[in-house]
A protein has these predicted regions:
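Mg2+-dependent phosphoryl-transfer enzymes with acidic/Ser/Thr/Gly-rich catalytic loops
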Residues: 4-8, 34-35, 199-282
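Short, structured coil segments at secondary-structure junctions
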Residues: 70-72, 80, 88, 186, ...
Length: 282
């Protein structure tokens, strides 16, 4: 029996576990590794009975190249809650993809914003992009994935997990306000995952609901759930933890949400979370 038996710690990946923001300052767009301190502390946590899972906004296509550098002993929740992947088989254990009418909804959005950049992440772990911009190229280079450029969303010939809108923050705020006025929005979720990233998923496909599904799959109790994240899309997850944590680099809305603030992501935020749990379960 380990001191962390029955404890589930879930964490966002980008700018919570790793300093993703730094790759946009690197000419070669290299993502730094998970800090050694975090790796050491997570291994200690798991060696003593704890379960650690990623709950990321990334699709599996974008998470897969980096998963070997993340100490984990559970499934990986992807695409802001649209799915849970068995890391060993790369198969979905749970799916909540966009509804069939999402392509028609996207066409309506594009009619209103004809130059909008969007990435359609597919259930077959591929991506289609409409109107790629420089940020799209940098995003793909940093995340080590390729995409197909299309002109019309109807060219996408697979189920769509999520749609990622890209652009300047002021423009995305205007887009967000427009989508919120649509009568069909009741069937969808919309959340910022970064300053230049706005994500559309199916209703119920959010980090809070997918964390509940992880607890169900792993047989863990809400009384021993701990969460870490830095962005607006992490808030549904952070709200359900017994105690939730945010790195010092988190956005103000997260820092002011009642979380426990730890060191920045690049300094080993999640490692410090384990240290705090070590004291709680002493």
């Amino acid at each position: 029996m380990g001191k962390f038996d029955g404890v589930l710690l879930v964490s966002d990946f980008d700018d919570t576990m790793v300093d993703t923001s730094s790759l946009y300052r690197d000419p070669q767009h290299r993502l730094p590794p998970v800090p050694a301190y975090t790796v050491e502390r997570l291994n200690y946590f798991m060696d003593n009975g704890g379960r650690f899972c990623l709950v990321t906004g990334r699709s599996w296509q974008i998470m897969r190249p980096f998963i070997d550098g993340v100490p984990t002993n559970g499934p990986c929740a992807v695409a802001n809650g649209a799915g849970i992947i068995d890391i060993s088989t790369e198969q979905f254990l749970y799916r909540r993809f966009l509804p069939a009418d999402a392509i028609d909804r996207l066409k309506e959005i594009l009619a209103r914003f004809p130059d909008l950049t969007c990435e359609l992440f597919r259930a077959d772990h591929r991506a289609d992009v409409i109107h790629p911009i420089a940020f799209t190229v940098e995003h793909a280079a940093g995340a080590k994935y390729t995409y197909r450029v299309i002109e019309d969303p109807r060219e996408t010939d697979a189920e769509v997990i999520k749609i990622l809108f890209e652009g300047e923050n002021d423009f995305l705020r205007e887009l967000e306000a427009y989508i919120h006025t649509r009568p069909w929005f009741a069937g969808y979720e919309l959340a910022f995952s970064g300053l230049h990233l706005l994500e559309l998923t199916a209703k119920g496909a959010n980090k809070g609901e997918v964390t509940k599904k992880l607890m169900e799959l792993l047989g863990t109790s809400p009384e021993h759930l701990y969460c870490a994240g830095d962005q607006a899309n992490d808030l549904p997850m952070l709200r359900i933890g017994v105690e939730s944590f945010a790195p010092a680099n988190a956005i103000p809305a997260v820092l002011q949400s009642g979380v426990t603030v730890v060191r920045s992501c690049g300094e080993g935020a999640v490692g410090e979370v384990v240290d705090l749990l070590d004291r709680r379960y002493a």
